[in-house]
């Protein structure tokens, strides 16, 4: 039986949570479907595709700032859209896909346009909470088109952004799957040895708070730094791990701001930059609390943390909060209430058995 062909849009060259999910989807469906990916450039994503023998086409830079979009960004997106739709139509004519699949946020409207012009069914996979009103309006408009057959949302709070009545009928909420075994049996020892070497001290009795994700403003690593500083001022011996790295020049500027903030707070010996890592299971095993301060549709990191029997602290307006209500594994703080953030983390660190579904002691106690 001939496999159906799927053309996949990905707008990042790296591999973060969304790209992990795209790769997982392709892995799970590889026996029934063939895939071809549209990606911006060579990088971590292209390396993963090569491992799977999945063909890809380079589309050029598709980087846009997160959050509310100004006029300059809107004009840039308009020009970027023209170029990408034109090039994508060329790929469609050559590859002849049966289905267009768009998990990359910038590519959602492009796939709807291409699906309409090429008469191909489109599936959207929404991972994000869109902070920009213009973006929400555009997605509700395009989501109503006949070419968009299904809209998969990773959480209810993501799906609820599609308010157009006809478009909302296409929404199906499917929580992202996670390989529990991959994260449930990590080796904490080697990470602790690495941290002790970097910090030049033993970590027995020290609590570790970890944030995982690309270093960028919408991930809010600045909140983690504030939490570590606040806990230090409260007399807590805590180390913060920043797992991930920068992608764009704006990200690199943000990281420099974070480094200056760390210097100003006097906590250089309490923050460890871990960079991009593949041994997340081991890092989680060495962690007491996973911190998710970003407003995301559904944090894959939170799911991985729960698989590793680690508690999660997140704010009360994210997909991770929705997940927390189901799993009961951790606690939350009020959005924009700075005083409650450190208290939430402190509560988790002081009550390691508060996790309703899982209990696991600190690897250093």
Feature roles, as predicted:
Residues 6-7, 202-219, 225-228, 241:
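Conserved donor-binding/catalytic core segment of Leloir-type glycosyltransferases
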């Amino acid at each position: 039986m001939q496999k159906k062909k799927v053309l996949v849009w990905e707008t990042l060259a790296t591999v973060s949570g969304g790209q992990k999910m795209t790769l997982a989807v392709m892995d799970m469906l590889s026996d029934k479907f063939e895939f071809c990916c549209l990606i911006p450039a060579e990088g971590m994503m292209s390396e993963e595709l090569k491992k799977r023998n999945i063909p890809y086409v380079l589309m050029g830079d598709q980087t846009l700032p997160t959050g509310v979009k100004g006029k300059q960004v809107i004009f840039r997106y308009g020009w970027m859209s023209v170029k990408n739709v034109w090039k994508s139509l060329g790929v469609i004519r050559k590859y002849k896909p049966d289905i267009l699949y768009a998990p990359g946020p910038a590519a959602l409207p492009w796939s709807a346009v291409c699906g309409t012009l090429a008469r191909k069914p489109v599936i959207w996979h929404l991972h994000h909470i869109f902070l920009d009103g213009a973006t929400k309006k555009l997605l509700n408009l395009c989501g109503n088109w006949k070419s968009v057959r299904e809209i998969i949302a990773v959480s209810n709070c993501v799906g609820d952004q599609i308010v157009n009545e006809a478009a909302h009928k296409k929404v199906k909420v499917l929580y992202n799957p996670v390989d529990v075994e991959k994260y449930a049996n990590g080796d904490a020892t080697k990470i602790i040895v690495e941290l002790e070497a970097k910090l030049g001290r033993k970590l027995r009795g020290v609590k570790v708070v970890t944030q995982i994700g690309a270093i960028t403003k919408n991930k809010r690593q600045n909140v983690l730094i504030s939490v570590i500083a606040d806990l230090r001022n409260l007399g807590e011996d805590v180390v913060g791990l920043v797992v991930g790295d920068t992608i764009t020049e704006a990200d690199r500027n943000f990281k420099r701001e974070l480094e200056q903030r760390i210097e100003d707070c006097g906590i250089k010996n309490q923050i460890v930059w871990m960079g991009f890592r593949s041994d997340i299971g081991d890092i989680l095993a060495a962690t007491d609390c996973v911190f998710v301060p970003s407003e995301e549709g559904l944090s894959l990191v939170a799911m991985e943390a729960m698989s590793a029997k680690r508690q999660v602290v997140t704010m009360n307006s994210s997909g991770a909060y929705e997940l927390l209500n189901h799993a009961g594994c951790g606690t939350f703080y009020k959005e924009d209430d700075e005083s409650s953030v450190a208290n939430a983390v402190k509560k988790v660190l002081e009550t390691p058995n508060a996790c309703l579904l899982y209990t696991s002691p600190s690897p250093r106690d």
